[in-house]
From Swiss-Prot:
Disulfide bonds: none annotated. GO terms for molecular function: DNA binding. It comes from Campylobacter lari (strain RM2100 / D67 / ATCC BAA-1060). This is Nucleoid-associated protein Cla_0113. Homodimer.
Length: 101
């Protein structure tokens, strides 16, 4: 199983992986993802780390708490899916760029 592995380069590989991971984390903070629900009545934005950075709610929803909650949940779930997909893509790029995959 480990016959062809050069363990002397393992430390170097791990150092490169950590450096690349740090770069990707900084890139993620700069990225912004947005999702809308209710035909644009609710818009939620998150950065690449998955932190919600903005929420916009149309004034017409302020009197309808239940609809607002449903639309907020939908928009938050959608934007989190975008962030998660981006994280998977970045992880794949990290490993493929190092020749691990």
């Amino acid at each position: 199983m480990f016959e062809n592995m050069d363990f002397s380069k393992m430390g170097e590989l791990l150092t490169k992986a950590q450096e690349k991971a740090n770069e990707l984390e900084q890139e993620a903070l700069k990225k912004e993802f947005s999702a809308k629900s209710g035909g644009g009545l609710v818009k939620v934005s998150a950065n690449g780390k998955g932190e919600i950075i903005d929420i916009n709610i149309d004034d017409s929803l302020l009197e309808d708490k239940e609809s607002m909650q449903i639309l907020l949940i939908a928009a938050i779930n959608d934007v989190m899916k975008m962030v998660e997909q981006n994280k998977k893509s970045m992880a794949s790029n990290l490993f493929s760029g190092m020749g691990v995959l």
